[in-house]
């Protein structure tokens, strides 16, 4: 039975189009018998922004403050959750040409030298191997494969850095460019999601 971790990151709650799409995928994969864990990074599972104190604490040590220890424990739990799943589904709506802050916070908690990646004589090596990722990215305009799409290259770089190179991308494009464009973008995204197997 496949285990799936879903990361929601939209700040729009019930109005979120990325949530609409990922919920479509969740329903489909649950019907196929997948065990799905949902982490709502902009809702009930919001994470703190990593500051200097937290960043220092994530390196570990024997003299951590209570806050640093709490954040290290949280990071360890997030990494364990990541490694325990076979597929990671990431929703990434475009906000001002970038990913939501809430998703970046998760990345900062799991990107740890010696834990999810390491440095070798031949360069960095990812330690989260044998996983698959699905990126669901929604945007109001049309940015796919263009110079304004920084989201997909960034997320592919991050995932590859920690060892996840099997990455599929589903685009919801031009969703704020009128009702017809929205309907077309959602329909095409759902078709792409329907083609994915768990």
Curated annotation (Swiss-Prot):
FMN binds at residues 10, 16-18, 94-97, 138-141. GO terms for molecular function: electron transfer activity; FMN binding; oxidoreductase activity, acting on NAD(P)H as acceptor; oxidoreductase activity, acting on NAD(P)H, quinone or similar compound as acceptor. The keyword Transcription regulation does not apply. Its EC number is 1.6.5.-, 1.7.1.17. It is an enzyme of class 1 (oxidoreductase). Gene3D superfamilies: 3.40.50.360. Keywords: Flavoprotein, FMN, NAD, Oxidoreductase. Its cofactor is FMN. The keyword Cell wall biogenesis/degradation does not apply. Pfam families: Flavodoxin_2. PANTHER family: FMN-DEPENDENT NADH-AZOREDUCTASE 1, FMN-DEPENDENT NADH:QUINONE OXIDOREDUCTASE. Quinone reductase that provides resistance to thiol-specific stress caused by electrophilic quinones. Also exhibits azoreductase activity. Catalyzes the reductive cleavage of the azo bond in aromatic azo compounds to the corresponding amines. Belongs to the azoreductase type 1 family. Homodimer. This is FMN-dependent NADH:quinone oxidoreductase. It comes from Shewanella sp. (strain MR-4). The gene is azoR.
